[in-house]
């Protein structure tokens, strides 16, 4: 999860997936996605020990751009060698959001759904695919 205001930003994470954010210096992945003890094992907010596993990141800067995603698109969204944001994945989304008219914004949920269920994406993952995007508007 993420909370951001003019006074700062708080990012919270438990489990896999991730939150990519631009705090004014380019996209970054402040928290490394968690992995369980075994492959395909993760931690959930409903686990008894969730509070002790919760990872947090704080900044005194507001978030200009945010993308939160589930593990199903993690390999598309991140450079897995160094857990950095894969810019060719995020740039079209953020550029589209920044320049979209209201009519185009109304179409984005359906277009995002089509993209996430497309053959090109499904060839690379068979896991759940969720992507939430946000921009700070002046």
Task: Annotate each predicted stretch with a short phrase.
Residues 6-8, 17-19, 25-27, 35-36, ...:
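Short acidic/polar capping segments at secondary-structure boundaries
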Residues 1-2, 19, 30, 131-133:
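Generic structural hydrophobic/aromatic packing signal, biased to beta-strands
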Residues 22-51:
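Glycine- and acidic-residue-rich phosphate-binding/metal-coordinating active-site segment common to enzymes
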Residues 12, 22, 67-69:
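Short, conserved beta-strand edge motifs with alternating hydrophobic and charged residues
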Residues 47-138:
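C-terminal catalytic subdomain
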Residues 1-20, 55-60, 123:
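Catalytic core of PPM/PP2C metal-dependent serine/threonine phosphatase domains
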């Amino acid at each position: 999860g993420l909370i951001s205001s003019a006074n700062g930003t708080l990012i919270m994470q438990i489990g896999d997936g991730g939150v990519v954010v631009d705090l004014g210096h380019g996209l970054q992945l402040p928290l490394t996605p968690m992995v369980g003890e075994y492959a395909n094992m993760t931690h959930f907010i409903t686990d008894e020990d969730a509070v002790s596993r919760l990872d947090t990141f704080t900044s005194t800067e507001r978030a200009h751009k945010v993308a939160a995603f589930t593990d199903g698109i993690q390999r598309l969204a991140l450079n897995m060698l160094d857990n950095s944001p894969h810019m060719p994945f995020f740039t079209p989304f953020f550029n589209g959001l920044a320049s979209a008219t209201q009519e185009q914004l109304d179409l984005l949920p359906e277009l995002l759904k089509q993209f996430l269920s497309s053959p090109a994406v499904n060839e690379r993952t068979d896991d759940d695919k969720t992507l939430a995007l946000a921009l700070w508007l002046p």
